[in-house]
Amino acid sequence: MQHKLLINGELVSGEGEKQPVYNPATGDVLLEIAEASAEQVDAAVRAADAAFAEWGQTTPKARAECLLKLADVIEENGQVFAELESRNCGKPLHSAFNDEIPAIVDVFRFFAGAARCLNGLAAGEYLEGHTSMIRRDPLGVVASIAPWNYPLMMAAWKLAPALAAGNCVVLKPSEITPLTALKLAELAKDIFPAGVINVLFGRGKTVGDPLTGHPKVRMVSLTGSIATGEHIISHTAPSIKRTHMELGGKAPVIVFDDADIEAVVEGVRTFGYYNAGQDCTAACRIYAQKGIYDTLVEKLGAAVATLKSGAPDDESTELGPLSSLAHLEHVSKAVEEAKGTGHIKVITGGEKRKGNGYYYAPTLLAGALQDDAIVQKEVFGPVVSVTAFDNEEQVVNWANDSQYGLASSVWTKDVGRAHRVSARLQYGCTWVNTHFMLVSEMPHGGQKLSGYGKDMSLYGLEDYTVVRHVMVKH
């Protein structure tokens, strides 16, 4: 397993403290990796800053060609990446290979094309004898912090638009799940000029803080928790860096009486529990109108009970383990608190799985109330709650009564209602009669404490640029 850092085009061993990397399916240590030292963090940023002088002036065509080459080598090494992701994260191998690798490749190919379509506004003479034009230029060095739930996917979301826009990047994957990012570094070093991509390993305090606080870093992009986002925003405030934050969610799933219940059940069984529920857009907070509440709870409970947890390399496995022991305890505590309310009923699941690994049973909780913690706080596990509602006005208010604002869905056969409700929901994305679907061409990002800035799409590319006005006297 590739365990070296990428700094200025060279693979080097970390010079800091060694940290264990676990297999969550067994709890065993896969290997130990040495963190980057403070000097290595500084060297990576300075290498990126030096490389920016040339990379920032390359043509969109040249940048696109590099991104396309990277997409090709990821595709060629898809099985290797899927196996690493499965071992390090506990994902079912078939899901990593069939679902995630193609999407990751597509992200790089999309931004390769988008790089050649990013234009400033060619303006005119707004002052006599002067011509104005608008440019969109890269910022410089971008520090990208990727999470542990989709390590390679999130690395792609951060690297592709930043590089396409002409920036240089220092990427820090989560210390829990670094293996695919380090493998990506090995392949990328022969495609991009030295210093354009740098990949470090380490914890937030030892590597993340000196990286994001470095005076030569001009932008920080994070996918992570609200607490981490708050810390980075505060930590970078003295240097007035641009920040790009995706900080989780608690997606409301609004099911009206006229919805296709079978479609809802099938959808939530998939969209609520994919990746063991470790997804910020997971369909985890169901609001069911009272006319169909009992039927939905009964049918969904039966469907969720058929989900198969198991070994990641088993083709029949639908849910793998959670990513760490600490996160398993977090999910278990949230469910135990829900049980303790007295009014929430466990329809299925509700406990850790016996044996090795960090497994939690797929869980459905009914009878949850709007103010319950299980409704208001992100669990980030295979746990879905169901709350009954009376009418459209009530459910829109309840759905918006949340600190999160990332994703939502509305299930109804009434087209007018679908439009009305979608227009009022305070979420970055609203799906109608589906959930969870993402494409490279459309933006992904939130509101409120879910953060700001967009991933994917041309909007995501623009986030990694600065708008400049150039005026020429003639």
UniProtKB/Swiss-Prot annotation:
Pfam family, one: Aldedh
GO molecular function: aminobutyraldehyde dehydrogenase (NAD+) activity; NAD binding
Active site: E246, C280
Sorted UniProt keywords: NAD, Oxidoreductase
Gene3D superfamilies hit by this protein: Aldehyde Dehydrogenase, Chain A, domain 1, Aldehyde Dehydrogenase, Chain A, domain 2
Entry keyword DNA damage: no
Listed EC numbers: 1.2.1.19, 1.2.1.-
Keyword match NAD: yes
Quaternary state and interactors: Homotetramer.
Full protein name: Gamma-aminobutyraldehyde dehydrogenase
Source species of the chain: Escherichia fergusonii (strain ATCC 35469 / DSM 13698 / CCUG 18766 / IAM 14443 / JCM 21226 / LMG 7866 / NBRC 102419 / NCTC 12128 / CDC 0568-73)
GN (gene name): patD
